[in-house]
A protein has these predicted regions:
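N-terminal, polar/charged subdomain of small-to-medium soluble alpha/beta proteins
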Residues: 1-100, 107-148
Length: 148
C-alpha cells in the first residue's frame, strides 16, 4: 500500500511498512512549504510490559481496507484541525523489541493544531485501523485488544 495525494486542502502520504519503518524517510516524503511546525509520533515495541520480557509483536491487518482507513483519518484531521500535511505508516508482520511500529508526522502553519491532530490520529488509528496485535513474550503468546 502506497498512497500520496496533494490537493487544495492538504497533502497525505500513507505507506505500508512490512519489513522496516524509516521514520525520517517518511517525514522527508512531505513537502513542508508553508508549514511552521511538524509534530511527530513514533511508536516502538517495548522490551518489557507488566514485569515480563516482550520478544516481539506480530501485527496482522485487513490490508485491502487499511490504506483507506488511514487516508480517511488523515482527511478528517486536515479538516478538523486545519493542518496541511500528514504522513503515516504502520508496520505489518513481526516487530522485535526496540523496533519502530508506527510513525505519524503532522505539518501545519502553527504548532497547536499539529499537536492536537497528531494526538487525535494515533488515538483514532488505535480505535479504527483494521490491525490486530499478538504479543510474544517470555510467558507465551496472546492476542491483544486494540493496538494500545
Amino acid at each position: 500500500m502506497r498512497f500520496h495525494r496533494v490537493g487544495m486542502d492538504g497533502e497525505i502520504v500513507i505507506r505500508e511498512s512490512p519489513e522496516s519503518l524509516d521514520h525520517q524517510a517518511l517525514l522527508n516524503s512531505l513537502n513542508l512549504d508553508g508549514c511552521g511546525a511538524v509534530v511527530s509520533f513514533l511508536g516502538i515495541t517495548r522490551g518489557h510490559d507488566n514485569g515480563k520480557e516482550i520478544y516481539r509483536l506480530e501485527f496482522d491487518a485487513w490490508q485491502d481496507k487499511l490504506g483507506q482507513v488511514l487516508t480517511d483519518l488523515a482527511n478528517v484531521a486536515i479538516t478538523r484541525f486545519g493542518v496541511k500535511k500528514i504522513a503515516m505508516s504502520h508496520r505489518i508482520g513481526s516487530v522485535a523489541a526496540g523496533e519502530n511500529i508506527v510513525s505519524i508526522h503532522v505539518a501545519s502553519p502553527h504548532r497547536k493544531e499539529a499537536f492536537q491532530a497528531c494526538e487525535w490520529l494515533i488515538d483514532e488509528l488505535k480505535l479504527q485501523a483494521p490491525i490486530w496485535k499478538k504479543e510474544v513474550s517470555e510467558t507465551g503468546e496472546s492476542w491483544k485488544a486494540g493496538l494500545g
